[in-house]
Amino acid sequence: MAESGAGYRVELAKTGRAECKGTVCGRSKIGKGDLRFGTFVDVGKFQSWKWRHWGCVTERVLRNVNKKFEGDIKNCLDGFNELNDPIVQEKILRAFEQGHVDEEDEERCRKMASDASEEKDRKIEEGELTSEEEKEPIQDLRKSHKRKSVEKSSVPNKKHKAERKRSPSPKIEILEDDEEIEDVASDKDEEEKPWSGDEEDDDELVVKDSEDETEGVSTIASQRPRRSARRKVDYAESGNEYSDSD
């Protein structure tokens, strides 16, 4: 079937289980007996037909199929000769000639999308949410989920931002007892107390000791023998010449 039609086929739907792959109808189910257009898909081990309503067939698909079959739709399009209704056959040929499906077929598919959306809303409102008590928990759940997602997005990434270490705060000691206050005051008085005469005596003793040490050193130096002075020679009287070797 795929070989004869080169991967394209038209037929009346045998069941109502197939879902339309087009977007005009909002991917609604193709009803039994509705005209549908199929594309054969061969992906390795899997081979299948992808169906869409005739009103969901786009201008691009019609143009590509007509180009591939070189305008011979009657003999090349698979399933065309199996259609017993001449009105349906004429509709197909007219679409390939004008480059788009009839407006009524496209409008019918748009209505399917609108009806499907309204039916879905009706089931949600009347089927699942029949009372205000059931609506409120779901609304609260949506709000809490949204709030959690916002909080999660606001948390900084620990991998990219280093943690800052807090420096320890200085400890402050509070003296509440009078005894501790007096001890602190006495310590300050001792630190600021001026030096007395006794301390001066101690300094004088240290100075005297240092003077004694220096005197001892000087006596030792004075005990060393002094060099005798060179005797002066009067060269004029002796008649000898002056020489440094003497």
Curated annotation (Swiss-Prot):
Q: What are the boundaries of the region Disordered? A: 103-246
Q: Could you tell me which SMART domains the record lists for this protein?
A: zf-PARP
Q: Where is the composition biased (Basic and acidic residues)?
A: 103-126, 185-196
* The protein's name: PARP-type zinc finger-containing protein C2A9.07c
Q: Which residues carry this modification: Phosphothreonine?
A: T130
Residues found modified as Phosphoserine: S131, S243, S245
Q: Where in the cell is it found?
A: Nucleus; Mitochondrion
Principal location listed in the UniProt entry: nucleus
Single GO MF descriptor: DNA binding
Renumbered zinc finger spans (PARP-type): 8-99
